[in-house]
Amino acid sequence: MKKLLAAGIIGLLTVSIASPSFAAEKQADTNVAVLFDGSGSMVQKTGGERKIDIAKKSVKSFAELLPKDTNLMLRVFGHAGNNKLSGKALSCSTTETIYGLHPYEGSLFDNSLSELKPTGWTPIAKALADTRKEFEAFDADGKNVVYLITDGEETCGGDPAAEIEKLRASNVDTIVNIIGFNFDVKGNEEMKQAAVAGGGEYISANSADEFEQAWEKEAQKFTE
């Protein structure tokens, strides 16, 4: 009996040493959330191509370049209602995770992106608040990075900088980066301040090439 007990203890110790705990695995996770502007202004063209199409291609390339074990989430905002007063309430109250927090799967990610059509207003603050809640519910330990893509300012009365500060102050350690697409000077300055509050950086892109290059550089940071 003593021999069997000793063998059992040794076996348990062997399993414990060979298999890292779930908590240890979770601590090593890298979680990336992309907040995607689907508001009506994204239908506008730059260099002959719609901003929404440029953004879709760039984000897809970014996702493909991430390390295979990176958890990726895609949340959209501005895609509900319409860009008139009749659709403002719905548009401003809706953000949606269209690709849940897990490693990149090409066809699933592509399908999620392909269905996105630029439609309504720009509830940036709500998108950030909903991301914080989702990260907290997921208990997202490890490295958490948020990328906010937008071509315009908050139009739903929210305060993006305040929501970024809440995200930073929560029990989820998160960095917020902002990629502004075709912003005016005033918008650039406001977004710079918001990115500083998020512990990240603000990247201004005024053309398709600049936007695509920005995402390539960001993807490289996860492999360095």
From Swiss-Prot:
| CDD domains (UniProt xref) | vWA_ywmD_type
Annotated keywords? Signal
Q: Which residues form the VWFA domain?
A: 31-224
Q: List the disulfide bonds.
A: none
User: What does UniProt give as the signal peptide span?
Assistant: 1-23
InterPro entries given in the database record? VWF_A (IPR002035), vWFA_dom_sf (IPR036465)
Q: Does the keyword Glycosyltransferase apply?
A: no
**Entry's family note:** To B.subtilis YwmC.
What is the protein name given in its UniProt record?
Answer: Uncharacterized protein YwmD
Q: Which organism is it from?
A: Bacillus subtilis (strain 168)
